[in-house]
């Protein structure tokens, strides 16, 4: 069966998560593989102790919620994302059909995406879906690509930008999208992944103990 990867990056939650919704609604994959990838050496070099602790606690919480909802664990991996996806794509045990993740303009995320796109150029049957409006209210790509777009510098600029995107209700509030519920539909979790990526498995609970 074809498998779709849910690559959690910046939205470590189940509710209001378009990446999760899009993957579960896709007809191109019958099983899912939920991943979070970190590089511990980079993480420790570029973040303080409190930020790292918060990330680990968030991963533990997401894992508990994922298990309660879908009956399986979030898979947390330590390593370079390009190496991990290469391992997944090269495995004969996995029929990977698509990868879902959130759109991001963070330099590290863009670099990881470009590395992944280079790998996928050799595996054209696997599609990468960058889902917008996960970490922002707007589709950033669409907004900045508009012909007359100028980066907002003041609150008045922000108000003008939002006025062009969202109508106001009778009380003068912007009518933005409602938060997405945790999907009721589900797919089986691909359960042979540990054999493929066992060298990268990471235990956030152990790191906090």
Predicted regions: what they are:
Residues 109-118:
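Short Gly/Thr/Asp-enriched flexible loops that form oxyanion-binding sites at enzyme active sites
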Residues 38-43, 80-81, 104-106, 131-138:
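Short beta-alpha junction loops
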Residues 95-109:
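Acidic beta-strand-to-loop metal/phosphate-binding motif
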Residues 147-209:
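Glycine/tryptophan-enriched, flexible segments
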Residues 75-91, 118:
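Structural beta-alpha unit
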Residues 1-71:
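N-terminal beta-strand-loop-alpha-helix module at the start
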């Amino acid at each position: 069966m074809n498998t779709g990867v849910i690559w959690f990056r910046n939205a470590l939650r189940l509710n209001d998560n378009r990446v999760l919704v899009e993957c579960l609604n896709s007809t191109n994959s019958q099983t899912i593989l939920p991943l979070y990838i970190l590089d511990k050496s980079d993480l420790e070099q570029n973040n303080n102790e409190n930020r790292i602790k918060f990330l680990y606690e968030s991963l533990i919480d997401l894992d508990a919620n994922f298990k309660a909802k879908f009956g399986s664990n979030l898979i947390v991996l330590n390593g370079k994302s390009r190496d991990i996806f290469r391992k997944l794509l090269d495995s004969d045990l996995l029929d990977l059909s698509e990868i879902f993740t959130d759109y991001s303009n963070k330099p590290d995320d863009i670099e990881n995406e470009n590395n992944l796109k280079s790998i996928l150029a050799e595996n054209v049957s696997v599609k990468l879906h960058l889902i917008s409006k996960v970490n922002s209210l707007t589709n950033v790509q669409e907004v900045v690509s508009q012909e007359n777009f100028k980066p907002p510098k003041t609150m008045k600029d922000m108000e003008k930008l939002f006025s062009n995107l969202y109508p106001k209700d009778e009380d003068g509030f912007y009518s933005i999208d409602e938060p997405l519920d945790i999907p009721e539909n589900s797919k089986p979790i691909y359960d042979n992944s540990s054999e493929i990526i066992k060298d990268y498995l990471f235990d956030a609970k152990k790191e906090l103990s």
